[in-house]
């Protein structure tokens, strides 16, 4: 019995020491991050001492990145959060849990996944021109404003995209995108999938578009069979589809043959 109690006591002390080291490590990382920042006064540490919060805009530069990750784990951001143009960023581990306005991680050529991205974003979410991004899994389930994943050369599917987007959804110029399945089911604005040269079908697009719909420049698109049933704005399609729009499709704007 004494041996068991000794083991429990030993394990407790070991855990306590480990927890203390982790806590000190977090504080050291925060100190290192804030030491050369002129905006250090906008930050605060969460009550559980696990996250760094901010009540204004946060901009992360490539020199802030540590081992391919964000410098500290962030919690709630009361403004914008940007970690764009960070060539060495590999992972969004440590990204904020919530961003009140914009979250931008565009032009990060080494980023391969959105795992770790905020679950709540108030305005825009942009991961455009992340040329190594292979999946949208990890993106927030809802983007209240715009969602932009355009020019992501390695993206082959929209699986993982938000289920609901308040305004526009842009997946244009994704040259290896093979399918639109996984696209938002609810959309409050335009849908742009133009210049996706390997796209062969419109399967997966929302049935109703509240802005323009652009599928021009998709040279391998073979059919307009799954075109949205109602388009509130203009429709942009290739010249080869002139006169081939399904009769049950309502376009309230102008049909533009690109």
Regions found by a protein language model. Give the residues of each.
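Helix-centric, low-specificity signal for extended rod-like, repetitive segments
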Residues: 9, 20-22, 90, 112, ...
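Concave beta-strand-loop units of leucine-rich repeat
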Residues: 54-66, 77-88, 96-110, 118-132, ...
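Leucine-rich repeat
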Residues: 46-49, 69-73, 92-94, 115-116, ...
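N-terminal capping/linker segments that flank leucine-rich repeat
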Residues: 1-82, 242-258
């Amino acid at each position: 019995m004494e041996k068991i109690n000794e083991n429990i006591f030993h394990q407790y002390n070991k855990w306590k020491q480990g927890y203390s080291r982790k806590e000190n490590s977090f504080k050291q990382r925060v100190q290192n991050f804030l030491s050369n920042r002129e905006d250090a006064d906008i930050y605060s540490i969460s009550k559980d001492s696990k996250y760094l919060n901010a009540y204004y805009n946060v901009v992360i530069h490539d020199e802030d990145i540590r081992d391919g990750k964000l410098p500290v784990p962030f919690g709630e951001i009361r403004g914008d959060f940007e970690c764009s143009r960070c060539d060495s960023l590999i992972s969004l581990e440590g990204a904020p849990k919530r961003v009140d306005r914009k979250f931008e991680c565009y032009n990060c050529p080494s980023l391969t996944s959105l795992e770790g991205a905020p679950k709540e974003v108030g305005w825009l979410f942009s991961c455009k021109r992340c040329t190594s991004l292979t999946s949208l899994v990890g993106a927030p389930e809802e983007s209240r404003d715009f969602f932009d994943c355009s020019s992501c050369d390695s993206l082959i599917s929209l699986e993982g995209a938000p289920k609901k987007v308040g305004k526009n959804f842009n997946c244009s110029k994704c040259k290896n995108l093979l399918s639109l399945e996984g696209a938002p089911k609810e959309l409050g604005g335009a849908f742009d999938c133009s210049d996706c040269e390997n796209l062969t079908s419109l399967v997966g697009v929302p049935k109703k578009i509240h802005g323009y719909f652009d599928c021009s420049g998709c040279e391998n698109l073979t059919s307009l069979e799954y075109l949205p049933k109602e388009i509130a704005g203009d429709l942009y399609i290739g010249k080869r589809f002139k006169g081939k729009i399904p009769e049950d499709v309502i376009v309230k704007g102008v049909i533009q043959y690109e």
